[in-house]
C-alpha cells in the first residue's frame, strides 16, 4: 500500500473515532458506524455517545439505571451489552427493559437486578409488575398535558349532554303515549 493510502486510512480512523467518550475506546467499522467499548470503567452514568454508535459495550460497570430516551439518538445501535452492572430494577429501568425487549429479547435474561430486594438476583426479563413496583405515574405522565385534559373534559360534557338528551326523549315519548 502506498504511503498516502496508509496516511488516508490513519486519518479516516482518527476522524471516525474523534467523538469517542472518555474513558471508552472506539473503533471505526468497515460498514460505517462505531464500536464503542466502555466495559469495566466503573461508570455510574451513561457517557455522551456518538450518533454513529452501532455496537455499545457497557458491561462490568456501576450502572444502576438508564434515563428514558438514552438510546433514541442512536439509530444504528444493534448490539448493547449491559450485563454485570448493579441494576436497580424498578420503574426507572422500564425504558431499558422495553428497548432490549424490542431489539434483543434474549439479552433480558442476561441482565440481572441487584436491587430492590424483591427483584434482587433475578433476570430483568422475568420480573413481574409487582416486582417492578407501581409504574402508573410514568404512564400517566405521557398523556396528562393541558390540551389532553381539555379534550377529556369536552368529551365528558358531550357524553353528559347526550345522556340528558336521551333522558328527555324517553320522558317525552312516555308522555305522548
UniProtKB/Swiss-Prot annotation:
Question: Per the database record, which ranges form the LRRNT domain?
Answer: 17-51
Q: Which GO terms describe its biological process?
A: blood coagulation; blood coagulation, intrinsic pathway; cell adhesion; megakaryocyte development; positive regulation of platelet activation; release of sequestered calcium ion into cytosol
Instruction: Provide the Gene Ontology terms for cellular component.
Output: glycoprotein Ib-IX-V complex; plasma membrane
Domain (LRRCT) ranges: 85-137
Q: Which Pfam families is this protein grouped with?
A: LRR_8 (PF13855), LRRNT (PF01462)
Q: Which PANTHER family match?
A: GLYCOPROTEIN IB BETA, PLATELET GLYCOPROTEIN IX
Protein name (Swiss-Prot/TrEMBL): Platelet glycoprotein IX
Which organism is the protein's source?
Answer: Homo sapiens (Human)
The record's gene field reads GP9
Amino acid at each position: 500500500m502506498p504511503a498516502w493510502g496508509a496516511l488516508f486510512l490513519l486519518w479516516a480512523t482518527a476522524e471516525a473515532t474523534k467523538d469517542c467518550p472518555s474513558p471508552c475506546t472506539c473503533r471505526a467499522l468497515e460498514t460505517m458506524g462505531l464500536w464503542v467499548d466502555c466495559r469495566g470503567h466503573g461508570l455510574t452514568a451513561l457517557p455522551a455517545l456518538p450518533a454513529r454508535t452501532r455496537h455499545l459495550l457497557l458491561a462490568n460497570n456501576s450502572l444502576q439505571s438508564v434515563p428514558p430516551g438514552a438510546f433514541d439518538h442512536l439509530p444504528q445501535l444493534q448490539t448493547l451489552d449491559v450485563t454485570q452492572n448493579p441494576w436497580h430494577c424498578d420503574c426507572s429501568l422500564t425504558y431499558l427493559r422495553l428497548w432490549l425487549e424490542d431489539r434483543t429479547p434474549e439479552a433480558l435474561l442476561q441482565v440481572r437486578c441487584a436491587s430492590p430486594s424483591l427483584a434482587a438476583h433475578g433476570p430483568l426479563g422475568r420480573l413481574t409488575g409487582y416486582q417492578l413496583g407501581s409504574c402508573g405515574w410514568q404512564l400517566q405522565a405521557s398523556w396528562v398535558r393541558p390540551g389532553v385534559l381539555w379534550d377529556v373534559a369536552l368529551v365528558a360534557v358531550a357524553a353528559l349532554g347526550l345522556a340528558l338528551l336521551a333522558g328527555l326523549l324517553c320522558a317525552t315519548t312516555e308522555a305522548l303515549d
